[in-house]
């Protein structure tokens, strides 16, 4: 017995949605965010919270939280459609742009946190050097300061890498097919 063509289509869409959810999870996003992104993406047009709630089986309250997470991560946006009174949400239809957005957001947070930690540790270690230290302790502080410099160099490099993606210069070296 052959499967109904509509069933095959629905199953294929479900597979796409699940793959998108798994990909989002790789960026540290909850799978529910990935599922909703996939649902809107596969819908190919903006959706309301009610439509999303029905598509996922989640409450409108939970759906509102998920959409807020997506808005905060810049992977969804609220759009206006003439004649529609409810808020509509859409997602980027370009996989490459979605990747750049997620990559940049994820790594920008990491860079920011680590640069703040660098400042704090650097300040603390420099103040320790003003104290009377044993030669071993002074050597250890200097090793840590050197490590901090390498750490800062790494996070500055990551900042440049993020800019490389955001400027889309990446496509000059790794073109889209």
From Swiss-Prot:
Recorded hits in Gene3D superfamilies, A to Z, give: Winged helix-like DNA-binding domain superfamily/Winged helix DNA-binding domain (1.10.10.10)
Q: Which Pfam families match?
A: MarR_2
Q: Which residues bind DNA?
A: 49-73
Q: Which InterPro entries match?
A: HTH-GbsR_regulator, HTH_MarR-typ, MJ1563, WH-like_DNA-bd_sf, WH_DNA-bd_sf
Q: Which GO terms describe its molecular function?
A: DNA binding; DNA-binding transcription factor activity
**Keyword terms, alphabetized:** DNA-binding, Transcription, Transcription regulation
Carries keyword Amino-acid biosynthesis?
no
Looking at the record's lineage, which domain of life comes first?
Bacteria
The family classification in the record reads: Belongs to the GbsR family.
Q: What is this protein called?
A: Putative HTH-type transcriptional regulator YvaV
Q: What does UniProt list as this organism's lineage? A: Bacteria, Bacillati, Bacillota, Bacilli, Bacillales
Gene encoding it? yvaV
């Amino acid at each position: 017995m052959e499967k109904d063509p509509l069933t095959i289509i629905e199953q294929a869409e479900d597979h796409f949605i699940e793959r998108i959810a798994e990909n989002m999870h790789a960026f540290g996003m909850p799978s529910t965010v990935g599922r909703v992104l996939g649902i809107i993406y596969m819908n190919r047009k903006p959706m309301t919270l009610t439509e999303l709630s029905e598509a996922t089986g989640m409450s409108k309250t939970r759906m509102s939280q998920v959409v807020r997470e997506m808005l905060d991560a810049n992977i969804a946006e609220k759009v206006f459609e003439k004649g529609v009174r409810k808020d509509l949400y859409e997602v980027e239809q370009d996989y490459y742009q979605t990747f750049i957005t997620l990559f940049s957001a994820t790594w920008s947070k990491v860079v920011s946190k680590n640069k703040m930690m660098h400042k704090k540790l650097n300040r603390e270690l420099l103040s320790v050097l003003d104290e009377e230290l044993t030669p071993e302790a002074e050597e250890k502080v200097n090793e840590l300061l050197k490590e901090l410099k390498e750490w800062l160099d790494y996070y500055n490099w990551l900042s440049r890498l993020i800019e490389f993606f955001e400027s889309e210069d990446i496509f000059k070296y790794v073109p889209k097919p």
